[in-house]
């Protein structure tokens, strides 16, 4: 396996995260061409964990509105520590550089927290440089 590390900064300043883990490169045909890269890791997010319920008793209308807005506009990860499975389809350009289409999922997996298990899915393009 190979070690990976990544940081994701949210431009709306909501749920940023950093992750580390392991991945395995599976060549599709001859080495130096296309490959799959499945991986698993752990992430830490600064996103919300444990949002308060909007239907709690004795709330002011303003507090109920605030909690309702949070419910519909923020992800409640349930935990700051999350699983980070990922999958990439890549092409090795040369010995040091690859380009990948990637999919990453963040979730507590009902292991780090019981109850709500909202997650975050992230798809994109990566430029990979091997040291």
Language-model features: where?
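Transmembrane beta-strand segments of Gram-negative outer membrane beta-barrel proteins
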Residues: 1-7
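Outer-membrane beta-barrel transmembrane domain signature
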Residues: 10-131
């Amino acid at each position: 396996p190979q070690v990976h590390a990544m940081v994701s900064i949210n431009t709306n300043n909501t749920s940023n995260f950093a992750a580390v883990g392991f991945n395995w490169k599976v060549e599709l045909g001859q080495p130096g061409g296309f490959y799959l890269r499945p991986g698993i890791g752990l992430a830490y997010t600064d996103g919300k964990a444990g949002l308060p319920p909007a239907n709690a008793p004795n709330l002011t209308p303003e507090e109920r509105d605030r909690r309702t807005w949070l419910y519909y506009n923020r992800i409640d990860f349930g935990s700051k520590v999350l699983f980070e499975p990922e999958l990439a389809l890549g092409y090795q350009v040369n010995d040091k550089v690859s380009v990948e289409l990637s999919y990453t999922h963040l979730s507590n997996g009902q292991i780090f927290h019981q109850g709500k298990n909202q997650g975050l899915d992230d798809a994109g393009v990566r430029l990979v440089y091997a040291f």
